[in-house]
């Protein structure tokens, strides 16, 4: 079984097959999704204290915060090969 892995910054990696959406954190509905995930204990903050620039939503309901742009994450998602994405932060 080949799993594509996506580098989301600072050495953090996500399984590409589990990603449902990659969105910007600016809108009120996305802020509400982040808040709800925090309350459920399903929020993963991978920003290392930096500004959140991308919100990754998984099929398991987990919400992952990343400090890199959604376009960058999406590009890595589209170009990822099985195993670890060679892009590094």
From Swiss-Prot:
Pfam families: RemA-like. Transmembrane segments: none annotated. It comes from the Bacteria. InterPro entries: RemA-like. Belongs to the RemA family. NCBIfam families: MtxBflmRegRemA, PRK04323.1. HAMAP family: RemA. This is Putative regulatory protein CYB_0055. The lineage of its organism: Bacteria, Bacillati, Cyanobacteriota, Cyanophyceae, Synechococcales.
């Amino acid at each position: 079984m080949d799993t594509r892995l996506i580098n989301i910054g600072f050495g953090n990696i996500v399984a590409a097959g589990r990603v449902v959406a990659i969105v910007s954190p600016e809108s009120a509905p996305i802020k509400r999704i982040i808040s709800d995930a925090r309350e459920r204990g399903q929020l993963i903050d991978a920003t290392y204290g930096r500004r959140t620039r991308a919100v990754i939503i998984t099929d398991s309901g987990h919400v992952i915060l990343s400090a890199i742009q959604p376009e960058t994450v999406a590009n890595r998602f589209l170009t990822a090969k099985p195993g670890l994405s060679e892009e590094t932060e």
